[in-house]
Amino acid sequence: MSDKKPSLSYKDAGVDIDAGNALVERIKGVTKRTHRPEVMGNIGGFGALCEIPAGYKQPVLVSGTDGVGTKLRLAIDLKRHRGVGIDLVAMCVNDLIVQGAEPLFFLDYYATGKLDVDVAADVVAGIGDGCEQSGCALIGGETAEMPGMYEGGDYDLAGFCTGVVEKSEIIDGTKVADGDALIALASSGPHSNGYSLIRKIIEVSGADLESHLQGKTLADHLLEPTRIYVKPVLELIKHVPVHALSHITGGGFWENIPRVLPKGSKAVIDGNSWDWPVIFDWLKENGNISMKEMYRTFNCGVGMVIAVPNEQADKAIQILTDAGEDAWKIGRIANAAEGEEQVDILADETH
């Protein structure tokens, strides 16, 4: 007579449905604090419903998706999870605002080897913080516990956001003209890009993440959440004709600014118009990184670049300053010769 086979459960395979349900209960308060009047129903359904806000004549939906990249490795190792929730939202909504869109709703995907409810709830609380900062509703998401796919409690994140813009008010760079002023918005640090290089610099330099730079630990500088520009930029758009916006993310200045410039134009950047935040000087020195590599990898203290008519530059800077941003004139638009690069950074090698 053969031995009776054990009765297996999903939990035996490493998936805890009860933990997933506990997480849903924990995050219901987060969705409530991000609620918008257009949202219909509550979380937990098969799909989330959202009306288009009233007042749009020809509404165009704008969507985007992004992640946080290897900044997550630092956050996991240092057990500091809430900030990367803000990062996740920021990377999505800042891309939407580039086209003039008001973010409406956000969904997240959280994948892990073993679900730690406290860690996941901390991340989602940060997502709620980011949604509040951008006026965006957190309306749903997916938590995937996948043993064998991720090591232990390691996790990955993806965000999905949808916004709306009036068709006649889409910002697509077609109005960019010779002589336009370029306005910079300060970043809060590296944001969510360049962290594979940052982690390599930490490795080769043997840096102590608890060492201090200008009153903050290195860890604090590196895990500072990505700045969200939605509300200040929406306010600017109401009062100034914005010709283009560029979110300075992966690829830095060299890759992102040309994405919003018409053929035959270039951005002339005065690299001496601002002082880099100390973390970028630290990265350059400890990684022995060239200036060109810095500008093509990191934001170097600039999270967003905005093109406006030159005569509107002072007004634009004042509006952004009043909204709490550190804004300044960083350069101008000029004509580009055939085959010429679309970004020209004039700066001292040592900065």
From Swiss-Prot:
Tree of life domain: Bacteria
Cellular component GO terms, alphabetical: cytosol
Coiled coil location: none
Keywords: ATP-binding, Cytoplasm, Ligase, Nucleotide-binding, Purine biosynthesis
Family annotation (Gene3D superfamilies): PurM-like C-terminal domain, PurM-like, N-terminal domain
Family statement drawn from the similarity comment of this UniProt entry: Belongs to the AIR synthase family.
Name of the protein described by the UniProt record: Phosphoribosylformylglycinamidine cyclo-ligase
Species for this entry: Idiomarina loihiensis (strain ATCC BAA-735 / DSM 15497 / L2-TR)
Gene (UniProt): purM
